[in-house]
Amino acid sequence: MQFFLSTDVIAGVNEALNLPEYVRQLAMKKPGIIYDANLSSSLYFQEILKGLVSRFGNSVLFCNEFKGEPTYAHLENVTEFFRRDAPDGIVAIGGGSTLDLGKGVALLLTNEVPALSLKGFPQDVNDPLPLVTVPSLLGSGAEISFNAVFIDEAQGRKLGINSRKNFPKKSVIDPQLSMTAPMESVIASAMDSLVHCIDSFGSHKHTPLSRIFSVEGFQRTFYALQQGQLDRAESRLDLAIGSICGTTALMNSGDGPTNGFAYYLGVKHKIPHGLAGAIFLKEVMRYNFDKGYDKYALLNPMRSSPSAKDATAELLGEMDELYRQLDIPDLVPYGYGQGNAAELARNVSDALTGSFAGNPVEFNEDSARHVIYNLT
């Protein structure tokens, strides 16, 4: 069994105000700071940024105004912006896309090659500049992962730069920073965490240790969403822990059909990744259950029956209620119905057979069609 963790995590209310000290600990003297444009109006973020700039007067600032997930072309442009001023480290503050952008910039600044040449799992690359991540949304897990997602516009596919050298050196998680985010974004990010937990839990490559993280991450996130009190810092910390656990489990096992569906639908319709995954998650779980997979019972600590089958059915019932509570849509608003479900199933199957292979029961194009029909 193999298992890896890498990023130092600091989590707590107001911890982002201590960011200058955490940056100093990495021996940065001229940090490049990338931050989400939608944070600009946050008074708390302004206080964080003021502290950084006061401590590091020659900081290089970049406001990321790019909408949606970054492209390789955008990565090239941002890297060139920073290359002119030669920062000695990167601090990325924002949602998952901005954190991934920070990983890409940190790597490209020490590897003067086209960004597209690093897509996939690049080998023999130089170490990146040290990176500190500060998430403003909790669920993508980008703050602690080595994966950095980028879109290849020519192919219309979501790929990435996935080197273990991408691991952030530190991640500073402060629930206060997420408090001004729109609630729909908070929920979509939390659903992304649930997808990571479920896909990794059922993955053929799971280990006993990865499953501990899958279960803990699922329960923290699921019950925070169920309670409907996401305006509380304590609930946001549960989402933060769920995000860390889910992504750690995913890195140490593998994904499944839900993540695959989300990648395809998200790129095609520019849907936030977490919401795209949420659309499919429950129906993939139900498909697996109908095929005899009842191990989801382990995710349900409040089960009223010792029967794994009954406990899984009970959990799926709770999922139904959560979806109603959160108003998670089906595929109809995105133009899908019975008439084009087969085409969507075929396209997803052609693009993402690797994700399908991770499912705990056989999952193929016919399976995808079944799931999609139930969502139209």
Predicted regions and their residues:
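C-terminal charged capping/lid subdomain of soluble metabolic enzymes
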Residues: R303-T376
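C-terminal catalytic subdomain
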Residues: S253-A311
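Fold-independent oxyanion-binding glycine-rich loops
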Residues: T7, V13-N14, D36-A37, F66, ...
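ATP/NTP phosphate-donor binding region
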Residues: M1-G89
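Carboxylate- and glycine-rich phosphate/diphosphate-binding segment that chelates Mg2+/Mn2+
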Residues: N147-S253, P360
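Glycine/threonine-rich beta-strand-loop-alpha-helix active-site module
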Residues: A73-P175
